[in-house]
Each structure stands twice: as structure tokens, then as C-alpha cells.
């Protein structure tokens, strides 16, 4: 199944074989000045994808209002994008576990620095040769060298996760992502609008 829609003159294509998000206005479409008539501006919007072209005569205030209105509608959710990714999110869960393993390693390392400098030195050198990017692999290797430290890291990461899950506001995170998406798209939209200079001779 292939679905397509347009966001501010840029096509967003979805394909099961090669999903992509195309937001480059220079490659998918053009927005440029056609004429200047007094204070009104002519903006020509063309798309190389469709071969179509539309000319609008807009004032600067009108363009600004359009930009603000369009930016509120830029986030389009299509369930077909990248397949049925939301079935499991197993990779996200793995990354969360790996991150809390990394955070636990840093916490334990800091504790050892304060309380047991010799063990801190050993653990630091172990981390240099065994990066805690894969939590399970790291703890397996650490357990072969120091079961005590491995158990300490495991207990610490579980404790840290328990603290985080109580403070995590999923609604707030969702809103932050949504607001950031809109801000970035609004910023990109304003960059694609070519504003005529005020000192250009009008005809």
C-alpha cells in the first residue's frame, strides 16, 4: 500500500519498501516571488512532484497568518508509515533498560569514588574496555569479574527506574514532543517563504 499527502508543498511518501519523509522544499517544491505590486506580494508555489503551479497575490500579514495557521496542521499521523511499528515497541523498551544500566553504572562509579578509591579504579578501567551500551552484555561480563559489583549495578538500575516511573509524566512528554514538532515545522515553513525587500521598485 502506498499513501501520500502534502505538507506545505512537500510530499510525504509512505511505502512499505522504502518509507521516507521528504521535507526539503528545494528538491520537492519551490516558493518564490513573482511580482511586487505596491504592498501586496505575488507568491508562486510550484511543485516538481506534480508539475502544477499556483500564483497567489498575498500581503505580508496574510502570509504570516497562513504560516501560523498551517503550522498547527503540520503534524499528520498516518498509521501506515513504517508499517505496524506500534505493535510492540520492543526496541524502545530495550533502549530504556540499556539507559538505566548506563545510569546505574555512573551512580555506582560515583559512589565508589567517594567510598572505595581502589575499587573505583578497577571499575573505571573495566568500563573503558567494556562499554555499558548493551546492558545485558555488560552485566554478564562484569559478573564474571566481580559478582558483587554486577549485583550492585542491577539493584541500582532497578531502584533508579522505580524512582523515574513515579515521576514520569507521559502526558507532559507527549505535549513536549508535539510542541517541538510544531515549532520545528513552523521554523522550516518560515525559512521557505522568500520575503520581498521593501526597497524593491514596484510596478
Curated annotation (Swiss-Prot):
Biological process (GO) annotations? carbon fixation; chaperone-mediated protein folding; photosynthesis; ribulose bisphosphate carboxylase complex assembly
Claim: Chloroplast is one of the keywords in the record: yes
List the Gene Ontology MF annotations in alphabetical order: protein folding chaperone
Task: Kindly give the SUPFAM superfamilies that the UniProt entry links to this protein.
Answer: RbcX-like
- Check the record and name the InterPro entries matching this protein: Chaperonin_RbcX_sf, Chaperonin_RcbX
What are the entry keywords? Carbon dioxide fixation, Chaperone, Chloroplast, Photosynthesis, Plastid, Transit peptide
Q: Explain the induction of this protein.
A: Not regulated by cold, salt or desiccation.
The entry describes its oligomerization and partners as: Homodimer. Interacts with rbcL, atpB and RBCS-1B.
Q: Which PANTHER family match?
A: CHAPERONIN-LIKE RBCX PROTEIN 1, CHLOROPLASTIC, CHAPERONIN-LIKE RBCX PROTEIN 2, CHLOROPLASTIC
Give the UniProt family note.
Belongs to the RbcX family.
Q: What does this protein do?
A: Chaperone involved in RuBisCO assembly process.
Protein name in UniProt: Chaperonin-like RbcX protein 2, chloroplastic
Q: What is the lineage of its organism?
A: Eukaryota, Viridiplantae, Streptophyta, Embryophyta, Tracheophyta
